[in-house]
Amino acid sequence: MVDNSKTRVVVGMSGGVDSSVSALLLKQQGYDVVGVFMKNWDDTDDSGVCTATEDYEDVKKVADKIGIPYYSINFEKEYWHRVFEYFLNEYKKGRTPNPDVMCNSQIKFKSFLDFAMDLDADYIAMGHYAKTVKDADGLTHMMRPKDGNKDQTYFLSQLNQDQIKKVIFPLANLTKPQVREIALANGLATAKKKDSTGICFIGERNFRKFLSEFLPAKSGKMVTPDGKVVGEHAGLMYYTIGQRQGLGLGSTKESTDPWFVVGKDLKKNELIVEQGYDSKLLYASRLKASDMSFFTGKPDHDVEFHCSAKFRYRQCDVGVTVKYHADDNTADVYFDEPARAVTPGQALVLYQGEECLGGGNIDAAYQEDKQLQLV
């Protein structure tokens, strides 16, 4: 049996069941485990309760139960500058960002990793559902976990080799129900705690209300692709490509089909809408992605390859051909079949079978050579 007692793992504990079980499993495997609660946001919910205080109390209970030391670290300043300012700037540009991807690359696997190394950690761990394997050359590869329904490789897609080689994913071969069972069997305080949902710093709060506290909303016209005014929008930042809900538009003489957001015109402050799920304006043949990241290192030359991809969380993989450009670290990605509602600002994530190759940020979508008016 391997002696792990001299290997220190610092576990980022959120106060949720997943990171609680991660810490427990590592402790059971004999590692020298230290729990750390990260406070990334000054979060008070709509009822005035500071959820971080409640979460830290749960971390204390779990750490005491499994017998590990615990600390709390505040990354609010780093989070504001590296994640939240990016989030706001993307919305100002009319894009729909994914701050959780940025939070992982800049905070959880950067600021937290640095802090853990100062605690003499050999590895870090959290409650993510992902898996890593090491090849014969010593390179660490990111793989999909056993629980495909909880697969979080999408959100980890912009980490690099130096980051993932320092990570253990204790939940790699477990399903969420199994994690709950382990927590219950070991009497962990978080065993029945519900999962957090939505963007981490918004939590259960109303999204529009939250965003309006930081960005002034400017109402404007809702127009059809040919310019006909059909309504008024509350602010372009509140809408995303392909959105159906919340438009407040009814059927017309021509059609009873629901309306969808098919574009944005920032200069005119107009939201472009059209009836019908299959609006041609929602389908792209290719996209342009920037800031590409690959787990095993960026190619030092242009390369073309076929793989599968996701351009939003939880969607099924779609076949793509990737043309990577080494000079500016961008990629042109061609879909095997036209793809619906490709949204600038979201993450593009590439897969080869069970392996997650990496990803980048979606900048634009095209129908052949024509750029879709998505921002």
From Swiss-Prot:
One of its GO terms (molecular function) is tRNA-uridine 2-sulfurtransferase activity. InterPro entries: MnmA-like (IPR004506), MnmA-like_C (IPR046885), MnmA-like_central (IPR046884), MnmA-like_central_sf (IPR023382), Rossmann-like_a/b/a_fold (IPR014729). GO terms for cellular component: cytoplasm. It catalyses: S-sulfanyl-L-cysteinyl-[protein] + uridine(34) in tRNA + AH2 + ATP = 2-thiouridine(34) in tRNA + L-cysteinyl-[protein] + A + AMP + diphosphate + H(+). The record marks 128, 346 as: Interaction with tRNA. Residues 98-100 are annotated as: Interaction with target base in tRNA. Pfam families: tRNA_Me_trans, tRNA_Me_trans_C, tRNA_Me_trans_M. It is found in: Cytoplasm. The active site is at residues 103, 200. Its EC number is 2.8.1.13. Keywords: ATP-binding, Cytoplasm, Disulfide bond, Nucleotide-binding, RNA-binding, Transferase, tRNA processing, tRNA-binding. Residues 150-152, 312-313 are annotated as: Interaction with tRNA. Its main location: cytoplasm. ATP binds at residues 12-19, 38, 127. It comes from the Bacteria. Disulfide bonds join 103-200. GO terms for biological process: tRNA wobble position uridine thiolation. Belongs to the MnmA/TRMU family. NCBIfam families: PRK00143.1, trmU. Catalyzes the 2-thiolation of uridine at the wobble position (U34) of tRNA, leading to the formation of s(2)U34. This is tRNA-specific 2-thiouridylase MnmA. It comes from Lactobacillus helveticus (strain DPC 4571).
